[in-house]
């Protein structure tokens, strides 16, 4: 496989990883916002229950409050799990992007070295041709 083809492939891979990372970041921001909303709602529900409990509540009303708090706690836990999975995926994608960028830089350095080597060889060939032309001219 030619080096230029490999370099283009690595650049495309890097761009795909950047797009994936952007999408994951957006999803993570959305998940964080949902978690914050659920947490705030749970706090409001808990505060309302505590205010109501200060006045005294019947058993059936207590059970209703308890089920509401349990449901909201469950939703919050699920949202935080989603947030954790997205954060882990985002960190992994960052690592993949970092690795792809390093690979591309290695290929870029290799291409530059090869270009310099070709330039050096061409310079030597030109010098040999000039020396040969000068030798012929001096012999005449």
Question: What residues fall within each predicted segment?
Answer:
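Charge-rich amphipathic alpha-helical interaction elements
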Residues: 1-140
């Amino acid at each position: 496989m030619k080096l230029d083809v490999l370099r283009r492939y690595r650049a495309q891979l890097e761009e795909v990883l950047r797009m994936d990372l952007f999408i994951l970041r957006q999803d993570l921001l959305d998940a964080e916002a949902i978690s914050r909303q659920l947490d705030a709602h749970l706090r409001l529900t808990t505060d309302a229950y505590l205010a109501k409990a200060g006045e005294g509540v019947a058993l059936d009303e207590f059970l209703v409050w308890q089920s509401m708090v349990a449901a909201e706690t469950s939703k919050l836990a699920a949202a935080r799990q989603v947030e954790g999975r997205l954060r882990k995926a985002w960190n992994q994608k960052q690592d993949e992007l970092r690795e792809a960028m390093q690979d591309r830089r290695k290929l870029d350095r290799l291409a530059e070295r090869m270009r310099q080597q070709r330039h050096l060889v061409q310079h030597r060939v030109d010098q040999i041709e000039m020396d040969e032309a000068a030798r012929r001219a001096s012999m005449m």
